Amino acid sequence: MTRGIVVKTKDKVKIAANYNKKGHKKVLIIAPGWCMTKDSKAFRQIARAFSSSYDTICLDFRGHGASGGFYTFSAKEEKDIEAVVDFAKKKNYDEICLMGFSLGAAASSIYASKYKVDKLVLVSAPYDFDKIENQMYKKEAWLETFRKFELIRFLTIRPSLFIHKKTKPADIIDKITCPTFFIAGKKDPTVHLWHTKELYNAAKCKKALKIYENGIHAEDLYLHHKKDFITSCLKWLNGDIN
């Protein structure tokens, strides 16, 4: 059963999320990237795909969807994850796992470097926000953006007009202690493959790396490789990948 929930961050921003409670003992928190929401078709599919094994909570970051505030491109979004994790803690799950996509992966890595989660999946995570390539002129970028475009979703996006100091995932990745699964596409035009490789090499936790040879960016890795993506992630989350 999926229901909408609203939690509040420590800086008083309301964060909306879809909570799919199936009675599992573990929960997977899903953190979309920039311009993606809990109600984006791709993320509804992702949450549904994992719900056979996990309760899921997919959030709207600040400045997205039904959440309040303005998006700060990973400067403050860890607070949004913190509020959702705190909600999950009250449900007494055996494990709280976190999966982030693109800038959602950046926020997830920052959160996990400070606070406890049981397992972490980072999909197309940037090494440094200022080094994101974002080559929108490439067919792999604009064509997929066009295919996923949802006007209702797009109209909810509210970026901050101010420049905020951002923590670089590169500077904190070695502080993550939970098992972490890095996933990337070799042909990613937005966050090039080297970002994930550098983060993986710098991580000191138990870790694994999966590269899709023909894969591109973030949720597109799921959309183009659905069965393998879900199977690989579940193997990692269940402790079956060393």
Pin down the residues of each PLM region.
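N-terminal cap/lid segment of alpha/beta-hydrolase-fold proteins
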Residues: M1-K22
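The serine-hydrolase catalytic nucleophile loop
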Residues: W34-R48
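Conserved alpha/beta-hydrolase
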Residues: A47-G68
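Catalytic nucleophile-loop/oxyanion-hole region of alpha/beta-hydrolase
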Residues: H64-K91
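Catalytic histidine-centered segment of alpha/beta-hydrolase-like enzymes
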Residues: G69, G215-K227
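Hydrolase active-site cap/lid region
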Residues: Y115-F162
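Short beta-strand/loop motif that positions the catalytic acidic residue
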Residues: I176-T177, F182-A184, D188
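Conserved alpha/beta-hydrolase "acid-adjacent" motif
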Residues: P189-H195
